[in-house]
Amino acid sequence: MPPFLLLEAVCVFLFSRVPPSLPLQEVHVSKETIGKISAASKMMWCSAAVDIMFLLDGSNSVGKGSFERSKHFAITVCDGLDISPERVRVGAFQFSSTPHLEFPLDSFSTQQEVKARIKRMVFKGGRTETELALKYLLHRGLPGGRNASVPQILIIVTDGKSQGDVALPSKQLKERGVTVFAVGVRFPRWEELHALASEPRGQHVLLAEQVEDATNGLFSTLSSSAICSSATPDCRVEAHPCEHRTLEMVREFAGNAPCWRGSRRTLAVLAAHCPFYSWKRVFLTHPATCYRTTCPGPCDSQPCQNGGTCVPEGLDGYQCLCPLAFGGEANCALKLSLECRVDLLFLLDSSAGTTLDGFLRAKVFVKRFVRAVLSEDSRARVGVATYSRELLVAVPVGEYQDVPDLVWSLDGIPFRGGPTLTGSALRQAAERGFGSATRTGQDRPRRVVVLLTESHSEDEVAGPARHARARELLLLGVGSEAVRAELEEITGSPKHVMVYSDPQDLFNQIPELQGKLCSRQRPGCRTQALDLVFMLDTSASVGPENFAQMQSFVRSCALQFEVNPDVTQVGLVVYGSQVQTAFGLDTKPTRAAMLRAISQAPYLGGVGSAGTALLHIYDKVMTVQRGARPGVPKAVVVLTGGRGAEDAAVPAQKLRNNGISVLVVGVGPVLSEGLRRLAGPRDSLIHVAAYADLRYHQDVLIEWLCGEAKQPVNLCKPSPCMNEGSCVLQNGSYRCKCRDGWEGPHCENRFLRRP
């Protein structure tokens, strides 16, 4: 084999081994801007009189796979074109050894027809005769095109490895008023693409492999040249620095080696040192400027607070992915409340064992807790101390009552490093962590030390911890699994320890910490998420006095749960002469508001139907639209004397089939058969002899509810999808498959197709 053919074969082999996903173009912008470029490409729409001809390279150097990507790019561009005989006309050529007209500009009058025809294009193979294709268009024009008053656009999709000279025919085309876009595919030769493209080159040279970026660039140029206005007025075209890369084989000097050289003059062969070279694959970089359109996004104003992540949803909507403690509000601005007076000292491990990353996470945890809990009328005072070799009180307890000032002061606390002397820090915190002016007697607030650490202590902790607890300090520990045993020894109880598995899980401990600060070891499952609806029989058979007993019982039960949008949500439905929602799941986000609403629930009288009330809960209470949370256990507690329950068995089973537990509290000396059928399983029925005895069965009810709250859930039961959308389980989550005309995460938005 001749040497040059051998080299060519080696080059082809090496090029074929390079994965096509290598970054052949890089726009130097942030990930957020890249997302905006991608989003804008889907919103751009060209509706003007213009003739657009695609010229697709179908040669062997492109290959069948890259030809399919070229077709995908052309189809994506067509998605943004108002194709009709009067507006945008589209045609297509394929070229290799010879040019082949796939369809002229006047063949199809709808977008669907054009896209379907492009999909049917078949790869031909052959040489890359770009020059012949351009000359064909020079001699015959754009087939099916209109007169010169209509802008003519030629979009050439090629790898730029033509076997002829393309500069002259492309120049002549441009002189005739044809706007030429050169779109690279596979490993493009950018020099040839620049020779093909119209001026300015940065606006007319694109890369088909990055289809959304290329589509955006093409429509941005059309907008800038006033061919068609493809974006909304508030969108803007901006120039960004970018790089184009070309994969080439280059010869590299490798050294000298002994060789023999002949001389014609002496007819002798002489020993000498000859240079030798190696071939190497390299990316050659071409600096460029890329022009792209971006539109204002709903997340530009940073609406999500407290570390929440803003996720755009369409043009104007957004969703905040909030840490657990802040998930109850649209902007992660949930305010938890403390129902006791407390002096709180956060004790942060600033030793080398925790590391700088761990220390910074602890500071963020304190910031988020402070934002969630403190307010102008808060009865909590907060301080912060750090420790390694010794204790440093960085923010004395109560120094700041203004939340922004307190958060700002936390930013200035430095990481110190050094040994982890937790025992010494606990002793010093007990002695001087709360200052010397602490009130005594009943007027003194509860004093709490919250220790945050990820490393084992290098000194003894049991004695200092006992010393701190003897001074009436409540010790709470927050740490990784590795230090659980040590934290339990320090706090004196496993119930005073909060362990996290990863950095995000640390922030999920905020509501649990808030609950422990004022809790007195009440029964219940205060940190378990639950959607709970009480259904009260307020028919004439119950009577106003017994209804008041039921209200008192519901208030007492609800107090055993942490009522806020991140943990337990409570709703109340009453039924008698009619069915009425006293309050929905997401309408009373605090315990105080919920208790007031329970007391204000109306007594209806009349004849009640438990079945109708259960269907009301199924249709109008336990739904995503009314505040029910996907992935959270759900339960309904029915309190009734038994009358009107004859029609309730089927509706109750409907609730159970959709993942909603139903417990019946039947009151009266004898339970009716209808009430037994309503209850279903025997463990879903609590029999109470009289309304006055309800309070004696509270613990049994709470235990049952806590058990239900810990059961695994099916994210699609009840379905979170609206407007008859179908819920599909997928990779531990779910997605909603929407009917035609609806879109959105829960099929909540009506989708109007463009004409």
Swiss-Prot record:
The GO terms this record gives for MF are:
calcium ion binding; identical protein binding
Note the CDD domains from the entry: EGF, EGF_CA, vWA_collagen
Taking the first listed entry, what is the main subcellular location of this protein, grouped into a coarse class? secreted
- Maturation and modification: A 55 kDa form is produced by proteolytic cleavage.
| Chain ranges of the EGF-like domain | 296-333, 712-748
VWFA domain residues: 51-222, 343-517, 531-705
Q: What is the protein's given name?
A: von Willebrand factor A domain-containing protein 2
Native organism is Homo sapiens
